[in-house]
Regions:
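A short, compositionally biased
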Residues: 21-27, 242, 292
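N-terminal targeting/tethering segments
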Residues: 23-143
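PPIase-associated folding chaperone regions across multiple families
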Residues: 25, 32, 138-216, 273-366
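Second-shell loop/turn segments in exported
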Residues: 28-32, 80-95, 104-114, 143-148, ...
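Peptidyl-prolyl cis-trans isomerase
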Residues: 220-280, 321
């Protein structure tokens, strides 16, 4: 009997000791300045940092094998050749992400920012869409809907900060003169037609000879626009439309297809968007160097070309109508740097023991 009782006591003691060793997920991992970091936001920052590392993986590295990949080395700067172990890179980027989140929220509050009900609804709606699409991955990494909603609000606050800092009545407003100069020298308003370099029925791609033939026909249409004497933007766009409607049937016929009923499109592009859209060699510079009222035809990607006309943006919209877009193009990089510096200056009260309960080795990357 004594032996059985002793065994029972030992078993109970073991259960108690094991219960005392259960590792629970912390609610927070500490703070940066006065900004408390939830465990969910920490896991999101860490997962995003891992994805950045995965994007830098070489062809012979498998980011899906998390434990192995964390021990490997990646090139983090192709220009300088700087390298880092993945685990160190993920740790650094996780902290940088958290600092940016904290800086965004703190600066937003300092400047009296307030999300509108519409913005909050937008954040919640997009967060739900992300969970619908990627919920299994998020949940596997400890990231729930509430965290994604929080993150979407941070993104909206970051966007609103552009107005709170640089807009009319902002902390350091940009003058109309500076906005106009940036608009005229760094942004491009286009009226354009996109022409696919494939048969729209069979999806057979054009060969080099067919591309050259299609581009020649489109350039002839651009020349017709440039030879017309049109003063106003509306007259210039009308000339583009007329030239396009005359040329498109022959252009599409090269591939045995017919044009759709697409009307002329218009868009104001910033410099970075121009470069990321016009990826074929020289195409971005061709568009950037157009004078107001001048047209050109370029192959802008591997699958499409464009018949485009540059228009004076202030002839179709007022500066007030374009203010937010110009500020975004002009000041996004500056704001990003300012938030990074602000975040790095915050006192670090992150709890190492809490973060150790959320190790990067537990990341699921399928």
């Amino acid at each position: 009997m004594k032996q059985k009782l002793l065994a029972l006591v030992c078993a109970l003691a073991l259960v108690v000791s094991l219960a005392g060793c259960v590792i629970s997920t912390p609610d927070t991992v500490g703070s940066l300045g006065d900004y408390e970091i939830s465990s969910g936001l920490y896991l999101l920052a860490q997962y995003d940092a891992y994805q950045k590392a995965a994007d830098l993986a070489s062809s012979d590295q498998d980011a899906a094998n998390v434990n192995a990949f964390l021990k490997q080395t990646i090139t983090v700067d192709s220009d300088s050749g700087e390298t880092a172990t993945v685990s160190d890179y993920v740790a650094r980027k996780t902290l940088e992400n958290l600092q940016t989140y904290a800086a965004t929220e703190l600066r937003f509050d300092e400047l009296g920012g307030q999300l509108t009900a519409e913005e909050e609804q937008q954040a919640d709606s997009y967060a739900q869409q992300l969970m619908d699409q990627y919920g299994d991955t998020y949940k596997a990494n400890g990231i729930g809907l509430e965290t994604v909603q929080h993150f979407e609000r941070i993104l909206l606050k970051s966007n609103d900060l552009l107005t709170l800092v640089y807009g009319n009545g902002g902390e350091t407003p940009v003058s109309d003169a500076d906005l106009t100069e940036h608009l005229e020298n760094n942004m491009v308003e286009l009226a354009y037609y996109v022409i696919p370099l494939y048969n729209t029925s069979t999806y057979a791609f054009a060969d080099d000879d067919q591309k050259a033939q299609m581009l020649t026909l489109a350039q002839q249409a651009a020349t017709a626009v440039n030879l017309a004497s049109n003063e106003s933007a509306s007259e210039q766009v009308s000339a583009l439309n007329a030239a396009a409607q005359a040329a498109l049937p022959d252009i599409y016929a090269v591939l045995g297809s017919t044009p759709s009923d697409t009307n002329v499109q218009t868009e104001l592009l910033g410099s970075s968007t121009l470069d990321s859209t016009f990826t074929q060699s020289g195409s971005a510079d061709t568009i950037r160097n157009l004078a107001y009222g001048q047209a050109a035809a370029v192959q802008y990607s591997s699958y499409a070309m464009m018949l485009a006309l540059r228009v004076d943006p202030l002839s179709v919209s007022s500066l007030d109508d374009l203010r937010d877009q110009v500020i975004t193009d002009m000041k996004t990089s500056e704001l990003k740097t300012a938030l990074s510096d602000y975040g790095a200056s915050l006192e670090n009260h992150l709890d190492t023991s809490a973060m150790n309960k959320l190790p990067m080795t537990k990341i699921v990357n399928k």
